[in-house]
Amino acid sequence: MKAVSLTKLDVSRGRMCAEVSIAQGTRDTTPALAARALAEFPSLASHACVNEKGATFGHVIDNTPLPHLMEHLVIAYQMRATLEKKQPPCAKVAGDVDGIPAPADDFTYLGTSEWIDESCGHARITVNFADDLVALRAFRDAESFLNSIVVL
């Protein structure tokens, strides 16, 4: 059984909306899960995020709904793909996104996540994109990554 399953993807101009199913017992992140996610994506902690505890995702990453983590992972995967197209990975310097130097003309990625029916584990995640194929891949990669780090 998978912790996270993409059940529907809709693409409209400049944004992609996914519906996901989250397995019972894995609906929220834990400090251990947050640590595994941050080990692969250190920049998650500094993502801007509207939440009740602070201005960044780092304030809530260890106790937030799993779809919220997936939203930020989709954005992180898009950022990585975009930056890798612009320049090859190299040594980490200030301003990097997980080891890839950020160019001056960054696209601003935005996203939202919400429960459609929390009791059934159904959620909606919406993100904007610069490239629809990159966003589609980002959703698939985020799903795969979460299923590799969530302990059922």
Question: Which residues fall in each region the model found?
Answer:
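M16/insulysin-pitrilysin zinc metalloprotease superfamily fold
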Residues: 121-152
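N- or domain-start disorder-to-order transition segments that initiate the globular core
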Residues: 1-41
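Generic "edge-of-domain/loop-turn" microfeature
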Residues: 25-27, 80, 132-134
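A common structural junction motif
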Residues: 30-47, 141-152
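Generic alpha-helix signal with a bias toward terminal, lower-confidence helices
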Residues: 30-34, 81, 86-87, 137-139
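Generic serine detector
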Residues: 5, 12, 21, 43-46, ...
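M16/MPP (pitrilysin/insulinase) zinc-metallopeptidase core fold and M16-derived inactive scaffolds
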Residues: 41-127
